[in-house]
Design a protein with these regions (language model features):
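Carbohydrate-interacting/catalytic domains
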Residues: 1, 6-9, 19-168
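Hydrophobic faces of well-ordered beta-strands that scaffold small-molecule active sites
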Residues: 12-16
């Protein structure tokens, strides 16, 4: 969810510890969080296993470095053969900072699908191989796509999203 919030809009915020630690246990019989700070002072264990602090920091570094994520009205959605996957193009006005963001909307199951990069609205302008670098991976990883309908899989436990920078 944070990848979506951080890439779809130029403005994003979150309530820190509960979100970073994935604390989502509901109070019995209510929607409210069982460990809410509403009526108590809480000392959070920020190093608790299973936190997503590194992913949030990585996403924030990407946002700060790239102009494409500092604008809101520069989104072009990319069709995908699987409705559990959302994909879109983000780019600056000059089209010198361009990204394809792909997110698995199913937080429990691995999902795979083909992206349709043939739409004229995307204006990718490539006729051959598309060179990409995934900045959301633990370490930047390069990909070469020869197909205008590339297939990819996203595992929510290992790789829930890709943030591909298009390298010209």
């Amino acid at each position: 969810r944070y990848v979506l919030a951080a890439t779809l809009s130029s403005n994003v915020g979150l309530y820190g510890p509960a979100y970073e630690l994935l604390d989502h246990e509901p109070y019995p019989g209510k929607e409210e969080n069982n460990h809410s700070e509403k009526y108590q002072l809480k000392a959070w264990d920020l190093d608790k296993p299973g936190n997503i602090r590194a992913e949030i920091a990585r996403m924030n570094a990407i946002r700060n470095k790239h102009e494409a994520f500092q604008r809101t009205f520069n989104i072009h959605f990319i069709p995908c053969s699987n409705s559990h996957i959302i994909a879109y193009l983000k780019q600056n006005f000059e089209k010198t900072d361009r990204f394809i963001v792909v997110v698995n909307m199913d937080w429990e199951n691995q999902q795979g699908g083909k992206l349709d990069l043939t739409a004229k609205a995307l204006d990718l302008g490539h006729t051959g191989t598309l060179r990409l670098v995934d900045h959301f991976a633990d370490a930047p990883k390069e990909y070469l796509w020869d197909d205008k309908k590339p297939y990819l899989e996203l595992n929510p436990q290992k790789c829930p999203a890709h943030i591909f920078q298009i390298i010209d």
